[in-house]
Structure formats: structure tokens, C-alpha cells
Amino acid sequence: MGRLFGTDGVRGVANLELTAELAYKLGQAGAYVLTSETKHTPKILVGMDTRISGDMLEASLVAGLCSVGAEVACLGIAPTPTVAYLTRYYNADAGVVISASHNPYEFNGIKFFNSKGYKLSDALEERIESIILDNSEKIQLPTGEKIGRKIEIESPLDDYVNFIKSTIKGDLKGLKVAIDCANGASYQVAPVTFFELGADVCVINNEPDGVNINKDCGSTHIEQLQKFVIESGADVGLAFDGDADRVLAVDENGNMVDGDQIMAIIGLELKKQGKLTNNTIVATVMSNLGLDIMAKREGINIVKTKVGDRYVLENMLENGHVLGGEQSGHIIFLEHSTTGDGILTGAQLLNVVKSSGKKLSELASIMQVLPQVLMNARVSNQNKEKYLEDEVICEMCKELENEFRDEGRVLIRPSGTEPLVRVMIEGKDRDYIEKRALELVKVIEERLG
């Protein structure tokens, strides 16, 4: 991670870490880096989620963008993937999203997309950082008629809704869909999308007030939707996070269907249609072993990357794979999109439910989700990378792997931001793997603490 940019843009507590001043500087430096070689007046799209700090940060960001001579189209409340798509659709030079995704309302963030709708490379983010922190490049500010201005785009969300509708054949008539908008960026566009696709739509958490985004709702608190699905008699529930780049589903019985299961369902359907390029799904090292077992049975390859949707996307682009994602519900359909898109994913999943004539619970049963235990070992920061060099830790992990064979696994990795080593064990018996995880955590803390 860089000095300003983390794994998903710049993030922090609004007005404390992510200030109006920093937003202005990010707008100015970002616009300069992304548009300095264009021969025309640059056009940049800006969207945001529903946080109270969004207006403040948008005003400062837009001022920075305009100061470099860019025309800025403010989309208002819009999901992150909507901004990515519309940046491509309108042939804009860049897109910017003001959002902290699934984080509490006090936080906010700023992330950029290039003209093709992809998140920026590390090199470009480092260049923006260097301009802001080191004054490494002198930005020549225009004067007179070359100063930028805000421009209007008529009904931008309608263009996104039409895009989602174009990705499936037929409609969703006959399906009752319960949606949890997390009081976030999807609160307008998600209900409209599924209504226009023909579904009977019922919605919760679609009344944002600036401080209730993600609060006990959405994909990080799916219990509310599980209850709502049962009460409303819905066929499927969809829970988005604050910026709607991820989604988790709920079946008709109120059971959660996570990102791994969604990829299993859609991946198998794409394989049947001959559309799963290389018969491969790209997942992360944190994906459930049940996905591997299902894939092996069905003749599908699973490729694993580091945790983070940017690494999933990199692998997909390098190898031509069309489906990838994370257990958390960040799922990428490279045929249609350049980033994780919860609304697109929901539409694809519902399309399989409708076309198959099966209940979501039956479709999800193709993959058995194995119990997964996650624990943290607290160690000194300078030692957290040394677990691979410790013979005792490595030997214990090897013994556990041999014990589980193909019915469990062990994964340990350092935290990127805290003095922790994260321990994950999967297996068929939850009580047993909890016991073994505690033993491993104790050994790691003794050896590296």
C-alpha cells in the first residue's frame, strides 16, 4: 500500500483523515495525471454514495478537477460499478467515486477509474501521491476560458439500468425479489432495475439519511434480509453493500448464499452454455474449499489469487477468464464489466433461477460450504512476515494439511495493516477445527510475539 492509496483508493475518517483539502488535491493531481496528454477538454464523471460527508468532499474534489481544466459531470448518488460503466459508455477520460464501500458512515473514500473503467495501476496511484506529497511535478493551471466547469448528463442512471437489462435474455417475471439497499448508493437504481426486468420487488433499507449507510443492514449484516425474505415470501433476497460493488444472496428458506456459491451456480451455467472461457473461475485463497470440491466434480478449474478483487481482475485480464470474485460477493463478469458489480451479479443469478425453473436453495446445493474458522494471532509487527521461516509453525501447518487431506485446509497470512497473523482453517467438524486453530494461534504467538 502507498502513503495515501490503500488497496481500494484513498480512505479515512471524513474531515479528520480524508479532508476537504485532501479531496481538492486528489482532484487536481488525479485529473492532471489522467488527462495531461489528451488533446481535447477532458471529461470526468463523479459519483458518490449516501454518506453525510459526500457533499463536502464532492465540492472540493470537483473544484480540484475543474482547476486543471476538466469538464465534470456529477452523477449524484451512484454505485461504484455504475460510475465505472458510464465512464466507458460516455467516452469520458476518467471516473471518480466518493465512497467507503462497506465501512461505517464516519469514513469516506475517493477512488479513480481510467477511461476504460478500470481501477488505476499502482504506478499511476504512486504518481498522484508523489505530486501531492512531494510536489514531484508542477501542475500548470489554466486561466480564462480553459478553466473547467460542471456539465449535465441527462438521466445517467437510466443508461446504466438499460445496460444491466441488456446482459440477460428474457425477463424476471414470476420472481419475487427482496432487496436490501444498505441505505447506500443502490437505493434508487437497484429497485428500478429489477422492477423493469419484470420482478415483483420488495425493498428494505432504501431511506438513506447520511448516517445510516451499512448500519445493521446490507451485505455485512445479512440477518435482517434473511428475516425479510421469510416474512415477504420472496423467492430470492439480494443484499448490497454501501456502494453496491458486492452482493450476497438469500434463498427462499432464509439461508445465505455467499459469493463462492454464486460463482459456483453461475459458473456451472456458463460452462453448460460453452461460455466459461478455459472452464475456469478465478477466486482468492480465502474461497471456501467447497468451491474447489464442486469444481473438481464438474470439470471446472479454480485459479487462486491473493485476497482483493484487484488481484482477481488482474488474473482474469492476463489469462482471458470471464468469471471471478470473492466470497464477500465482489464478483466480476469480464464480458460485461470492469469491476465488481452487485446489481449485475444479482441480475445474472436471478436469470439462472428463472431460466432453470429451480429454487435458489436447490441451485446452491451443488456446493457444500465447509465450516471455516478465522482467528488472529497477535505478534510483533516486525515478525509478522516471518512465519514462513519458522520451522515449528511450518511443521504444524504441514501436519494439519496431511491430517485433513482433501477434506480441509490451513491458511495463514500476515495482516496488511495490523500486527497480526491471520489463521484460517476449514474442515468438516467446526468444533475440531476451532480447537486446532486455537492451538495454531498459540504457537504462532509464542514463536513470533
Curated annotation (Swiss-Prot):
Keywords: Isomerase, Magnesium, Metal-binding, Phosphoprotein. The modification Phosphoserine is found at S101. One of its GO terms (biological process) is peptidoglycan biosynthetic process. HAMAP family: GlmM_B. GO terms for cellular component: cytosol. The gene is glmM. Coiled coil: none annotated. The active site is at S101. Its EC number is 5.4.2.10. InterPro entries: A-D-PHexomutase_a/b/a-I, A-D-PHexomutase_a/b/a-I/II/III, A-D-PHexomutase_a/b/a-II, A-D-PHexomutase_a/b/a-III, A-D-PHexomutase_C, A-D-PHexomutase_C_sf, A-D-PHexomutase_CS, Alpha-D-phosphohexomutase_SF. Catalyzes the conversion of glucosamine-6-phosphate to glucosamine-1-phosphate. It comes from Acetivibrio thermocellus (strain ATCC 27405 / DSM 1237 / JCM 9322 / NBRC 103400 / NCIMB 10682 / NRRL B-4536 / VPI 7372). Activated by phosphorylation. PROSITE patterns: PGM_PMM (PS00710). This is Phosphoglucosamine mutase. SUPFAM superfamilies: Phosphoglucomutase, C-terminal domain (SSF55957), Phosphoglucomutase, first 3 domains (SSF53738). Its cofactor is Mg(2+). Binds 1 Mg(2+) ion per subunit. It is an enzyme of class 5 (isomerase). Mg(2+) binds at S101, D241, D243, D245. GO terms for molecular function: magnesium ion binding; phosphoglucosamine mutase activity; phosphomannomutase activity. It catalyses: alpha-D-glucosamine 1-phosphate = D-glucosamine 6-phosphate.
